[in-house]
Amino acid sequence: MRIGSCVERPTEPRHLSTWFGHADLMHFIDRCIEAEGVGFLVVWGVSANKRSWWDNRGAERLGFHPTQDAEACAAEVLARPNPLDTLGQRFQGGSFVGINYTRHDGAAQTPAARAEAPSLP
């Protein structure tokens, strides 16, 4: 199982692709436990998001059919500033990408912080 962003409601633009609603999570776990004769399978724990990045057709073998879609919250999410720094916005890992990131080229900083930082040679 590869779990997406399992939060009550999408709160950032990235969640429009990765959100995993709680009702879909419960259905997914049930299907992962109860499905028979599947063998080895890698599946994404993600709702039926219109903007999803992942091909999750393999989940059909489990009988998993998500019903929730982050798109219902898109207008609200996109009306707010993106809380992720530039690194988090660029990569699939979101806010986790910059944890213990040691490269000092400013890539993990916000544009405002980068403007205040001394430039590197």
Describe the function of each predicted region:
Residues 5-12, 82-86:
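Short charge-dense sequence patches
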Residues 3-9, 19-40, 48:
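Alpha-helical substrate-binding/gating segment
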